[in-house]
Amino acid sequence: MKKMIAIVLALAMALALVACGGGATKMTMGTGGTAGTYYAYGGVLGQYITNNAEIEVVVVSTDGSKANIQSIDAGDYQLGTVQSDVLAYAWEGTRSFESEGKIDSFRVVAGLYAEAVQLITMDPEIKSVADLAGKSVSIGAPGSGVYFNAVDVLGAAGLTENDINAQYQSFADSTDALKDGKIDAAFIVAGAPTPAIQELCTTTNAYLVPIDRKSVV
């Protein structure tokens, strides 16, 4: 809690200095889908800044990290929540930014919280990542941070996209598809505990699948 307060205060003071220096008094913050952690967290953070730094922060729902970096580079947003590995992809021009090239016009203000790669299912046959073979699995939108995290975890278990029935869905679409029985499992990358996953595990027989340490290091 103390760390969170320190981060928020540092961000608020930094933006206040911008305002005092004759800079912008209104900023747009890109977050993520409305069902995810970015949007909820961004809403609280934006309101705090608005109340304490004399800068109005307008929080908007977006497609996530890559879209936020692109919008900051284009000048449409001034702030954005971004997955740290996607930030590195942009800076280096790799993976999700390989086709369009590097973007290095942004700067990091603060690290907010750790995100967890989570694998959720309602299929009792799925007890490990290896059990995803032949299953219908949401691995995030193409080129997204979730997508590359999922590909890395699958690879560590000896699987590729071709070994599963890959579905390229957003956070909200993934949880809805699980509820409706349209997919067998989904990769979710978000701050833990994740409210949408908690709700799903509480109201259905959904559960988190263990991911071996060797799959994430």
Model-based region annotation:
Residues R213:
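Conserved phosphate-handling catalytic cores of large alpha/beta enzymes
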Residues C20, E98-L112:
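A structural signal for short loop-to-beta-strand junctions that line the ligand-binding cleft
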Residues V216:
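Conserved small/polar residues in nucleotide/adenosyl-binding loops
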Residues T25-N51, E56, A114-D180:
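Bilobed "Venus flytrap"/periplasmic-binding protein-like clamshell domains
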